[in-house]
């Protein structure tokens, strides 16, 4: 069997100063060109991606157009919208590349639900800001309409709604994703960390939360029995003491040493630390698992061992 890889695209892959569809599609086109050698390789590929700016824009649109005739959609539904939108853009550009290569591979997007624990303590301490900024007066009105919602001041720029970021427990569509990936298909899944859902009676329902993309990608990689989790970010390597005079580049590291560095606070919370924690979980999930952390431009060189940070047991 060929190597199976989950590629977690960082936000920089689709980030642009302009928020138009055309500008974001152009950014994705450039990003996918960097992955062209991987698409031309025998590897079985699943791609996950972030959705922060996109879902933020959707939430602002929902708030501005909210009325009896066009009611605002909830966060879980906006998450599904963003998965479809970004998945469509990715499909278009990957399909363009596959056609140029005369490849017989196909590409498709799975709108992905991620099960979370309704008793996760993170629900008691929402910290993830989403959507537009509000004045204090607007927040007072919103809290009457949404009594369960939490709003916090954001660096003096106004107030924003904050939601929980629970840990993923399972990926509901993982068997479908695995079946597709084990063929020649390139699968786009777990966009934005997936749509958070909890089990209720004989089905699942969405909850107001945002799942960390790297944790969701790790869970997906584990469930589909991937060999490699590749986390693409905005730096070529992981560093300890990043941006300090004594910063040190890591090229190859075992999990035991990585855990020691994490415990010593060598990685920044909210940026590199979640990636490190996801890497540790995946490597420990089975035999011969590896994680590569690098930037988009070096993805293929990292896969063949020439670039990036390589993490193993």
UniProtKB/Swiss-Prot annotation:
The keyword Lipid biosynthesis does not apply. It catalyses: hydrogencarbonate + NH4(+) + ATP = carbamoyl phosphate + ADP + H2O + H(+). Its main location: cytoplasm. The keyword NAD does not apply. One of its GO terms (molecular function) is ATP binding. Keywords: Arginine metabolism, ATP-binding, Cytoplasm, Kinase, Nucleotide-binding, Transferase. One of its GO terms (cellular component) is cytosol. Pathway: Metabolic intermediate metabolism; carbamoyl phosphate degradation; CO(2) and NH(3) from carbamoyl phosphate: step 1/1. Its EC number is 2.7.2.2. GO terms for biological process: arginine deiminase pathway. It is found in: Cytoplasm. It comes from the Bacteria. NCBIfam families: arcC, PRK12352.1. Belongs to the carbamate kinase family. This is Carbamate kinase 2. It comes from Staphylococcus aureus (strain MRSA252).
């Amino acid at each position: 069997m060929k190597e199976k890889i989950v590629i977690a695209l960082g936000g920089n892959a689709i980030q642009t100063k302009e928020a138009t569809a055309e500008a974001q599609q152009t950014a994705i086109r450039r990003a996918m060109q960097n992955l062209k050698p991987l698409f031309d390789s025998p590897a079985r590929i699943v791609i996950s991606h972030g959705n922060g700016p996109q879902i933020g824009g959707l939430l602002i649109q929902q708030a501005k157009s909210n009325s009896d005739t066009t009611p605002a959609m909830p966060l879980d539904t906006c998450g599904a919208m963003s998965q479809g939108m970004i998945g469509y853009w990715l499909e278009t550009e990957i399909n363009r590349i596959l056609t140029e290569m005369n490849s017989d591979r196909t590409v498709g997007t799975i709108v992905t639900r991620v099960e979370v624990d309704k008793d996760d303590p993170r629900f008691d301490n929402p910290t993830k800001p989403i959507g537009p900024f509000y004045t204090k007066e607007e927040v007072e009105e919103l809290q009457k309409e949404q009594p369960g919602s939490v709003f916090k001041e954001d660096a003096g720029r106004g107030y924003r709604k904050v939601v929980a970021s629970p840990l993923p427990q399972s990926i509901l569509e993982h068997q479908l994703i695995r079946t597709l990936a084990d063929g020649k298909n390139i699968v786009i899944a777990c966009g934005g960390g997936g749509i958070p859902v909890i089990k209720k009676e004989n089905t699942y329902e969405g909850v107001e939360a945002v799942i960390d993309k790297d944790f969701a990608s790790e869970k997906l990689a584990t469930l589909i029995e991937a060999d490699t989790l590749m986390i693409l970010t905005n730096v070529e390597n992981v560093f300890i003491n990043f941006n300090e005079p004594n910063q040190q580049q890591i090229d190859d590291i075992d999990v035991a040493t990585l855990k020691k560095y994490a415990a010593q606070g060598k990685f920044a919370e909210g940026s590199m630390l979640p990636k490190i924690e996801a890497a540790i979980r995946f490597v420990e999930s089975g035999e011969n698992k590896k994680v590569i952390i690098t930037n988009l431009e070096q993805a293929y060189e990292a896969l063949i061992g020439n670039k990036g940070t390589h993490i193993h047991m």
